[in-house]
Amino acid sequence: MATLWGGLLRLGSLLSLSCLALSVLLLAQLSDAAKNFEDVRCKCICPPYKENSGHIYNKNISQKDCDCLHVVEPMPVRGPDVEAYCLRCECKYEERSSVTIKVTIIIYLSILGLLLLYMVYLTLVEPILKRRLFGHAQLIQSDDDIGDHQPFANAHDVLARSRSRANVLNKVEYAQQRWKLQVQEQRKSVFDRHVVLS
């Protein structure tokens, strides 16, 4: 049992370290992306015009200067076509908070790591809990094999005890046991007593 807990702790620390490493890599990529685009920018989307292809221009300027003449550099057209070209461009002033984005991603990855750790914990510990809490399964099977008129008398006591436990695993086990009892009762009524299912 001690080696199992030691293994779980090592697995948990390994998962935490991998989640932390993933967070650091993601933050590094976000900081690289932040170098390309600041938190405040003006973005102009210009469609194709004559022989010039469409293009997207980004520039870190104030909101009052967010127009085609200040953002589009170098200007792809000359002379009188500049005004016609700029009328086609759609410029938007954008603000974002990269700190909020980073914090949100860290929280998301932390929750994901905790859920993964919890899943591994349940996967490894569930068989031990089943053996300890529901070791009475052989008793129910032996009563059923004998053909007693009340084969589930002990099962009702066990189910009543499991009902008092408040964790999710016991509630699921209780629902499974209750369903199995109903199925067995229906089988008994159909095959032994030849009664149609209700």
Swiss-Prot record:
Record localization: Lysosome membrane; Early endosome membrane
Signal sequence, start to end: 1-33
Pfam families (UniProt xref): Tmemb_9
Family as reported in the entry's similarity comment: Belongs to the TMEM9 family.
Post-translational modification: N-glycosylated.
Coiled-coil stretches noted in the UniProt entry, renumbered to this chain: none
GO biological process: positive regulation of canonical NF-kappaB signal transduction
Transmembrane segments: 105-125
This protein's name: Transmembrane protein 9B
Residues the record lists as Phosphoserine modifications: 142, 189
Residues carrying sugar: 60
InterPro entries: TMEM9/TMEM9B
Topology class, membrane: Single-pass membrane protein
Keywords: Endosome, Glycoprotein, Lysosome, Membrane, Phosphoprotein, Signal, Transmembrane, Transmembrane helix
Organism, as annotated: Homo sapiens
Function noted in UniProt: Enhances production of pro-inflammatory cytokines induced by TNF, IL1B, and TLR ligands. Has a role in TNF activation of both the NF-kappaB and MAPK pathways.
GO cellular component, one term: early endosome membrane
Domain of life: Eukaryota
